[in-house]
Amino acid sequence: HAGTDFAAAGGTPIYAAASGYVQVAGWSTGGYGNYVIIYHGKMSDGNTYSTLYAHMSRTLVRKGETVRIGQRIGKVGSTGMSTGNHLHFEVRENGERVDAMRFYS
């Protein structure tokens, strides 16, 4: 299981971890349910980063939309392959999933 799961009540707001633009917003056939991917671009380390937010009860952004850090992008839910309300969060570096704990402060 790649990513970090955060238990939360259904409907709890989900906020963008960093500014960027919405690459994907919608339904996943791969088990994520309602999900959003935000592309954050190339950083000073030369790598590109994106974040993924999954199992939302509702998405509040659309593909192509620019979002700012802290903007509400969806609501916690249990869609897709999920057994209860939670946020599944992933960080991707150059398109590959990496340990999100590296980025928590």
Regions found by a protein language model. Give the residues of each.
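Short hydrophobic beta/alpha edge segments that flank linear recognition/processing sites
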Residues: F6, Y35-I38, R68-G80
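Disulfide-stabilized cysteine-rich extracellular repeat microdomains
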Residues: G11, R58-V61, M81
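Acidic, glycine-rich catalytic/binding loops that coordinate metals and/or anionic ligands
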Residues: M43-N47, R58-R72, E90-S105
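Short, well-structured beta-strand-loop connectors
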Residues: P13-V24, V61-V76
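Zn2+-dependent peptidoglycan hydrolase active-site motif and core
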Residues: A16-R58, N85-V91
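Short glycine/threonine/proline-enriched tight-turn/helix- or strand-capping micro-motif at secondary-structure
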Residues: H1-A18, Y39-H40, E93
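Secondary-structure boundary/capping motif
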Residues: A8-G10, H86, R97-D99
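Residue-level structural signal for beta-strand termini and adjacent loop
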Residues: S28, M56, S78-T79, F103
